[in-house]
Amino acid sequence: MKPRPYSVFLFLHIVFYSLLSAVNGSPSLDYFETCSNFVPRAGIPTFSPYAVIKNFDEVNRMYYIQVVGNLSGVITIVGGNGSHIHAASVYSETYALGKLVTSNTTKLCDVVMDPHSFEVPIKCPWAAGSAAFMVKVPFKSTLSDYSKYELTTLTTRVIVVDGTPEKNVITCMKFGLSTTLYYFYPVISYLVVVSLAYVSFSIIYALFLNPWTGSLDPFKSIFNFNMDPDALRLTSLGFFDFVQYLQFAVSTAQVSVMFPKFYINIMAALSWGTALFRFPIFSEPAEYQFADFADLSVASSSYADYLPKSYGMYSFLDSIGIGTACWLPFLIVMVIYLFAALFVALLVIFLKWLMSRIFNETIAETRWDTWSFIAGSLIRLYFLTYFPTVAYMSFQFVAPPTGYEIIPVLWFIFFGIFIPVYLYMNLAFVEPSSKLLEDQTYLHLFGSIYNSFREERVMFWIFPIAVQFMRGITVGVIGSSGSAQLAIFFILEVANVVAYAYVRPHFPQTSMNTLNTFISTMRLITVILMIPLDPRLKVLGISRDLLAYAILFIHIMVCILFLLLSTQRFMEVSARLLGAKSESKGVPLDRPFGWARVFGINELRRRRLKDPYSNGNTMMFDHSTYNSNEMSVPLTPVSVCSNSLKKDGEAAPPKLFVQTNCIPPVTQASSLVPSKNNTASSSSLMLDSPVTPSSPYSTSQGYSFYRPPKPKSSVRKRDMDQLRALQLDFLNNKPNLLRHDVNYAVREADVYHPHVDTSIDSLSQISSQPFEMRPTAIPPPPKNAFQRAWQIVQSTAKSIWHSDPPKESEKGFVVLRSRPRPNLQKPLPQLHIEPSRDEQYSMERKKTDDSLAESAWSIPHP
């Protein structure tokens, strides 16, 4: 039997209705106390309340409060007809943030009822202390009239006076009332869902289109095979970080502290972030009683004894509209999320196949790669829902039993403890560890766990998992003590700040360490603001509401930060695809907050082609002898050498006189062989003019140019062991529609460091000269504090007694280019070889024979 199309739409309608529909419950009581300025007077009867019961009429949307208490003495009741009638009365006033909202006056005899018979009125007069009675306080406004007060606490004050002309006060009590989110519930839910979708689309946009690791292959784009810091910078504070912060915000409402009910209602509207919302078949009206016949008049009893079921997880589940057995709707929502994750994984695989067809690219894939990618997507979902799994399943250990408790226990043991231990055993003993970053099998399955950490910090993923586990146990099991929960939350956030600030598991170029430290600091401030809400401190009234507003303000600021980073992500990737680049003038691509690097005024100036004659130092040259089409963009010279004449009297091209530390003058006519003329006192280098080097405007042979110095603050060191893939292949090799004028294959070494051609052997000859300053051996770093202190003392003494003369500061560096080497014929030196002893004897004998022969020829013959 085929599923009909309308059944699918009906299922989606039920899911979204459950996600975004408001809870149809009654208002909730926040606190109940006696007025601080009420002092019982002698001789006047008093009414001592000991319980509060709230009631709500679903038909006419009216609600009222029943206060149960004991009466001491006889209340004077004056009745009869006439214009001057005095009777015992009940005054009720409702305030919102100190402003009067409504007031009502009712005769006491009209609202007094028997607490044991319920809704049975007591006739006036009645005997003192004969029975307790209830005072019914009605509100003559419907619930819709209070919709604008859904995000605040309605403080109600009830005053009972007798029927005497003096109107003696019998009792005075205050309690807080919070209405359910009826109108603001969909607004908050839709707003957060749209924000999360916006962050998600920005991450997808950056993963596939960034100029470093962007690729048609979604496996490589999503799991970031190259571990490129620039790509990680664009994806920092993404979808997972946003969801985890929402889970933290929801967990604050699950702590047993005296939060106002409206704060818990707001966090309940975000409960879908913890895989729990009001599913229709498990929903029930929020009819939780604040205190049902709690004897507050007994001295041994205290207000804090009744808090565990008034705040924390109980109140949070009450705001959602489900019972304490929350594990069953949680598992149903998890099944829905599981199918959603499978659908997204299959959609990614389909897009991979579709893009390969469109661009005619052959993407090598195997069946194992596909299955491992699907399994890796499920692991992502598992870690995304790890905190609610631990929190809701562990809560069943202390919740009232409802049957089938073995299911949440087994779920907690398997998914809360066994799976993390199994993953640790699989990843901790992989040899070599680089296999985790190079093997596609590990990256497909487990890459989402550690692919944002550095290689030496790849096992740092254990720390956030341990923090999530401890936070879940805290809100699930330790609900009876709000102080203990606050202490554990404080320790966890301090550990987070120290871990990200000291261990620094992410690449420095990504700014993820700084951003995670900032988020942890915001969470720590939130926990500190929760401390005054401890039940033992009894902070009530407006002060408690202001603390809740401050915490909500922090949550809003963090959400705005996520939206700003997503906007910057969209704009930076779009600008780079359109041709913007920040590599010119040595500005690195890995700078944080690349928005200004793309659209800043300095970057816009660098993109303009400068006039070759705009430089004042080059305008002193004779322009008439040069062709403007053959001129290159001049760089900043130091000075111009004058009186440069050729042998025939013509003016020679101007020369640059560049100061150096240890390189002697080098010209075409000068010999590179050490001689007496090239002395160590030479400290300058004669180079050709910056107008002559080759450039896009000229094809002439260029020799050298001078690059001005850069401020040290604008250069950010990179990790030397990280390679960069700066070319977006599928955009550069595709039709003109996707092509852009950006060369991402420029090496960083060509930007920052002087380029020296290997064909120039003059540097090797210069290095052989005796006057070159060679680098001295660097002593090994000291091992302990004593050696460091001794090294400081030695360096200080050496600088005092052997102070060197001040040297001229370095003015930049010279980039040498290849030039035709002059063919210099060097005369070969005459070799003088000492003869051996036999050779000397033969040579002397030969000389003797020659002399005898000459003397013989010189004797005259007879």
Swiss-Prot record:
Cellular compartments annotated: Cytoplasm; Golgi apparatus membrane
Biased amino acid composition, Low complexity: 689-700
Entry membrane topology: Multi-pass membrane protein
Lumenal side: 26-61, 209-230, 278-329, 394-404, 481-483, 536-545
A Pfam cross-reference name: TRP
Transmembrane segments: 62-82, 188-208, 231-250, 257-277, 330-350, 373-393, 405-425, 458-480, 484-503, 515-535, 546-566
Assigned GO CC terms: cytoplasm; Golgi apparatus; Golgi membrane; membrane; plasma membrane
PANTHER family: INTEGRAL MEMBRANE PROTEIN (AFU_ORTHOLOGUE AFUA_7G01610)
Region (Disordered) residue spans: 668-717, 815-862
GO terms for MF: calcium channel activity
Cysteine disulfide links: none
GO BP field: calcium ion import across plasma membrane; transmembrane transport
Signal peptide from the UniProt entry: 1-25
Keywords for the protein's UniProt record, in alphabetical order: Cytoplasm, Golgi apparatus, Membrane, Signal, Transmembrane, Transmembrane helix, Transport
Cytoplasmic topological segments: 83-187, 251-256, 351-372, 426-457, 504-514, 567-862
Compositional bias per record (Polar residues), positions renumbered to this chain: 668-686
Protein name (database record): Uncharacterized membrane protein C1322.03
Residue stretches of biased makeup (Basic and acidic residues): 834-850
tRNA processing recorded as keyword: no
Family classification: Belongs to the transient receptor potential (TRP) ion channel family.
InterPro entries: TRP_C (IPR010308), TRP_Flc/Pkd2-like (IPR040241), TRP_N (IPR032800)
Top-rank taxon, per record: Eukaryota
